[in-house]
């Protein structure tokens, strides 16, 4: 990231730093299908950072969860909790060697999914486990929240065609959007960039990606909003 101006992901994109230093630890968040991992990988390539990525397909309960949430909700949730906690622990152990990272999750969001997926007794058990883990997650220097409508999420999920996600329904995505919006309405744990992702194509549009990176490089504190329609 010191002097890097060219990235290579699926294509070469020029990013002009203009003397600006990227945030050291960036976390990208948002609902299912919004493009978290795509953006995290692109930012990591731009700044020559290491990625810290969720591995949803490693969760053996997830496909059954999307078909019938009640039966395996707790197992699905605990698997993700342990996976995220392990990734954070591994990150802390290697931080001295690789201090610059981009993650496609924020540890504090884990209870959001638990709140909408678990019944009361299950949530109490989940919360005990969560508290016992005492996860000392490092604070990001910037959180990027990708926000998109349910229609856009459904379209992107369909377009990427993952078999594991075929059973995701509109109602579930609407509820997820609600809890994400509420969470980030009050979030003050790190500088926050809220991105209107409805009309932005970070996967395929070089211009959209460059506009976003140019905007986030100037952020040092506070809450910011990126609406790509303002740049056109």
Where do the protein language model's features map onto the residues?
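NTP-dependent small-molecule kinase module
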Residues: 158-166, 174-232
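Conserved substrate/cofactor phosphate-moiety recognition/catalytic segment
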Residues: 45-83
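A glycine- and Lys/Arg-enriched "phosphate-lid" helix/loop adjacent to the NTP-binding pocket
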Residues: 110-181
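Post-Walker A alpha-helix
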Residues: 39-40, 44
């Amino acid at each position: 990231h010191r002097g890097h101006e060219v990235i290579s992901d699926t294509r070469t994109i020029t990013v002009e730093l203009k003397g600006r230093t990227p945030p050291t630890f960036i976390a990208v968040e948002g609902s299912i299908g919004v493009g978290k991992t795509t953006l995290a990988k692109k930012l990591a390539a731009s700044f020559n950072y290491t990625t810290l990525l969720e591995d949803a397909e490693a969760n053996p309960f997830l496909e059954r969860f999307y078909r019938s949430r009640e039966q395996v909700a707790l197992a699905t949730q605990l698997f993700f909790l342990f996976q995220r906690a392990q990734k954070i622990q591994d990150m802390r152990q290697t931080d001295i060697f690789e201090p610059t990272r981009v993650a496609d999750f924020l540890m504090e969001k884990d209870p959001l999914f638990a709140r909408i997926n678990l019944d009361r007794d299950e949530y109490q058990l989940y919360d005990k486990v969560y508290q016992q883990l005492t996860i000392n997650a490092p604070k990001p220097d910037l959180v990027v929240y990708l926000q998109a409508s349910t229609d856009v999420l459904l379209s992107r999920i369909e377009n990427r065609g993952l078999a594991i996600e075929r059973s995701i329904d509109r109602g579930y995505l609407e509820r997820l959007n609600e809890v994400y919006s509420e969470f980030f309405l009050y979030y003050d744990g790190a500088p926050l960039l809220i991105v209107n992702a409805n009309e932005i194509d970070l996967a395929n549009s070089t211009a959209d990606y460059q506009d976003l990176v140019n905007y986030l490089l100037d952020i040092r504190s506070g809450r910011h909003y990126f609406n790509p329609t303002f740049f056109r």
